[in-house]
Amino acid sequence: FMNVMKKDHAVFLDVPDFDLSRLVHADKLGIEIVDDMRPVKLGKLSVLHGHEYRFSISNPVNPARGLFMRAKVSVMCSHFHQTSQHSESDLDGKVVSAWSLGCLCDLHPRYMPLNKWNIGFAKVETDNEGRFEVSNYRIVDGRIYA
């Protein structure tokens, strides 16, 4: 958001109340705006935008597999705008999973009209011990699919 504003609407940046946190009343809603390149934790699940690894996430299978190969922990990202999931168990049977999320934006913007994007979102539930359950949804023709 702020990158677009700096580029296309710089005149607004000098207005004191023109800040994403203030515009959406994040403090009143208990929302923390994460505007830097740092992982966020939802229990034991790491959440990234996905660009933190720069161009080093290759995804010959799907974005979640590429993310899994880099992170080596249970992780979720949204940078690729594609719904995917990848899981593997280690020698001790511990399951590690990665998810990439669809997007809630224009699927064919001018800067990238040909892509593999899809509409989607995720819901994450956590418990007091940090365990988590990810529901990764895809929206097709206005219907939500798990």
Predicted regions: what they are:
Residues 1-34:
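Active-site neighborhood of divalent metal-dependent phosphoester bond hydrolases
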Residues 42-137:
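Conserved beta-sheet core of the metallophosphoesterase superfamily
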Residues 135-146:
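Short, solvent-exposed aromatic-acidic interface loops
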Residues 24-35, 54-64:
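Active-site glycine-rich loop that binds ribose-phosphate moieties when present
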